[in-house]
From Swiss-Prot:
Protein name: RNA-binding protein pno1
Domain KH: 158-207
Major localization listed first in the record, in broad terms: nucleus
InterPro entries: KH-I_PNO1_first, KH_dom_type_1_sf, KH_PNO1_2nd, KRR1-like_KH1
Assigned GO CC terms: nucleolus; nucleus
Region entry Disordered, spans: 1-39
Keywords: Nucleus, RNA-binding
GO molecular function: RNA binding
Length: 234
């Protein structure tokens, strides 16, 4: 502490002694007194309707050429969606869409997505039994691509390319399906593949090589090698 004589001397010189203030103890006390819950964000509790999945709806557009197959196979589509997935399904005649909705009996969170993939696979041209695998198995996927994205073709060149993908009597397509354990649908210039991730990759590689002009014999050899490597890996 400065004495009175030193303070008077500093006052005469015109300078003021600055004392260092210690705020460490005060800051510690302020932090201890602070309420950690004061700045917490309070969220309202989730509604029971959202937990039960009410109100979720999916619409799948049905192309015109699939109206008759949908009508003929409606019972096969209706049964697994309602009995196994516990969903509500109907065909809206006005919008030409298949509407799938959850209800109180719906238990599985992914049931709505499985049913939507199942119906979409059927509308793309897959058989009901093949599309039903999307409901039973979780590791199956659906992939589509356009031949024009691989190689731009027009007119007769596009028709010959699609013919190479199918083969005589569908032999090439069936061979690729059997080797890669997938299902393939050729719809105009669109190609739809149903299977597991690795198998879809093998089938897509074979189809793209055919589009690019490789002979089927070389494509078969490459495809069998890739399929054997996938089999050894798993």
């Amino acid at each position: 502490m400065p004495t009175q004589d030193s303070a008077a001397k500093q006052a005469d010189d015109g300078f003021q002694l600055v004392q260092k203030k210690s705020r460490k103890r005060k800051m510690t006390m302020d932090m201890d007194d602070a309420d950690p819950k004061a700045g917490a964000v309070v969220y309202p509790p989730a509604k029971q309707e959202k937990l039960e999945g009410k109100g979720e709806l999916r619409r799948i557009a049905v192309p015109a050429h699939r109206y008759t197959p949908l009508k003929d196979n409606w019972l096969k589509i209706f049964t697994p969606v309602v009995e196994h997935l516990h969903l509500q399904i109907r065909f809206n005649l006005k919008s030409r869409c298949v509407e799938i909705r959850t209800c109180k009996e719906t238990e599985e969170p992914s049931a709505l997505q499985k049913a939507a993939d199942f119906v979409r696979a059927f509308t793309l041209g897959f058989e009901v039994d093949d599309a039903l695998a999307l409901v039973r198995l979780d590791e199956l996927f659906l992939e589509s691509f356009d031949v024009q994205d691989v190689k731009p073709l027009k007119g007769d060149h596009l028709a010959r390319c699609i013919g190479r993908l199918a083969g005589k009597g569908g032999r090439t397509k069936f061979t690729i399906e059997n080797v890669t354990k997938t299902r393939i649908v050729l719809a105009d210039s669109k190609v739809h593949i149903l299977g597991s991730y690795q198998n879809i990759r093998a089938a897509r590689t074979a189809l793209c090589n055919l589009v690019l002009g490789k002979p089927p014999s070389k494509v078969y050899g490459t495809m069998r090698q890739l399929a054997s490597r996938i089999g050894e890996r798993f």
